[in-house]
Amino acid sequence: MITIKKGLDLPIAASPAQVIHNGNTVNEVAMLGEEYVGMRPSMKVREGDLVKKGQVLFEDKKNAGVVFTAPASGTVVAINRGEKRVLQSVVIKVEGDEQITFTRYEAAQLASLSAEQVRANLIDAGLWIAFRTRPFSKVPAVDATPASIFVNAMDTNPLSADPAVIINEYKNDFEYGLTVLIRLGVKVNLVKAAGVNIPTVDGITVHEFAGKHPAGLVGTHIHFIDPVNLTKTVWHLNYQDVIAFGKLFTTGELFTDRVVALAGPQVKTPRLVRTRLGANLSQLTTGELNVGENRIISGSVLSGATASGPVDFLGRYALQVSVLLEGCEKELLGWVMPGSDKYSITRTVLGHFRKKLFNFTTAVHGGERAMVPIGAYERVMPLDIIPTLLLRDLAAGDTDSAQNLGCLELDEEDLALCTYVCPGKNNYGPMLRTALDKIEKEG
């Protein structure tokens, strides 16, 4: 077992009850284009087209063979694009239950499948995009082979669901999915929380992690178990995609159910809800929120994406929906107040010393300014890197030094705590993405 000593468990109120309920019915779903790093779509549908569940919506021009399939049957009501015609979303109004079927196997056949059979079925069904690479966090090429595959079956994000509750709901499908992964012919690492009982199968290497967030992030797992570099790549996926793999191979149908944590200070009844991949989040949260100007987040409060307008949908990789009150109100002479209702990792407010949960808002309590190296980054960074120097290089655009300091091991979510504790209010995620894009381009 690996225990993480550095990090931060954000003391935020309204964690979800770990019991699964059915969520609101949604009649719109979407595929979000900006989730897929470096993807350039070749559209296979137009607005007004009728599509079946599992039908190809678009293909990646830059990654031949990688297709993105419809999460529901219905009508394509919008294809939203942003600046420079970047694809934001393909929105489907859910109608009927027509679907495309894929190759089906008996459970007893799964352990004898070839790697080619596994790849072909995942690619055809559009489930190949469940894999992401490290470094760069991109969907892998269909003919690529990683050094290993990581299945993340733990979650330490604030307000997250307990993966064990969901996995045990789909125990057999999870085991089938693990069996399918083994047939790809590379080492499969299953990472779970210490002491938690979840199913596994022969051939899987099980690891346990304990400690504060980010103990549950896949970047932490990769760093300690099988570190990557510019010439070594690993893949990772989450436990709900493993369940979807198992469903696909034993039923021949695309499984698009998602169980997500609906939580946060503005949620009336925080709990786990069953919905569908790409669900419209305004519809999912109807009647669920307290009065106020709320920000709905697809994902964690630390690293999720604001869901509104053309991207008001559950992300492909999101396992939670978080809701915070917009922090619009200004506080007169707030800087001289003791701050008993505020939290900080430093001893600058009284709330630091109080063992309580806080109703966080989106307010950042200050404007962006220069980095201030007061040791805050080191307190929340458990990886074997020097965070202050790395963040300085990312801010300065020095990719050579950033690469030497370990930026290739990271994704935006791995720097989310550094962003949160930064006295200068700097957002390091976009800086990291800019550096990674430049490193990949320059080779």
From Swiss-Prot:
Catalytic activity: a ubiquinone + n Na(+)(in) + NADH + H(+) = a ubiquinol + n Na(+)(out) + NAD(+)
GO biological process entries: sodium ion transport
Alphabetical keyword list: Ion transport, NAD, Sodium, Sodium transport, Translocase, Transport, Ubiquinone
Entry EC number(s): 7.2.1.1
Gene Ontology molecular-function annotations: oxidoreductase activity, acting on NAD(P)H, quinone or similar compound as acceptor
InterPro entries: NqrA (IPR008703), NQRA_2nd (IPR056148), NqrA_C_domain (IPR022615), NQRA_N (IPR056147)
Similarity comment text for this entry: Belongs to the NqrA family.
Role this protein plays: NQR complex catalyzes the reduction of ubiquinone-1 to ubiquinol by two successive reactions, coupled with the transport of Na(+) ions from the cytoplasm to the periplasm. NqrA to NqrE are probably involved in the second step, the conversion of ubisemiquinone to ubiquinol.
Subunit and interaction comment: Composed of six subunits; NqrA, NqrB, NqrC, NqrD, NqrE and NqrF.
Alphabetical list of NCBIfam families matching this protein: nqrA, PRK05352.1-2
Entry protein name: Na(+)-translocating NADH-quinone reductase subunit A
Organism whose genome encodes this protein: Haemophilus ducreyi (strain 35000HP / ATCC 700724)
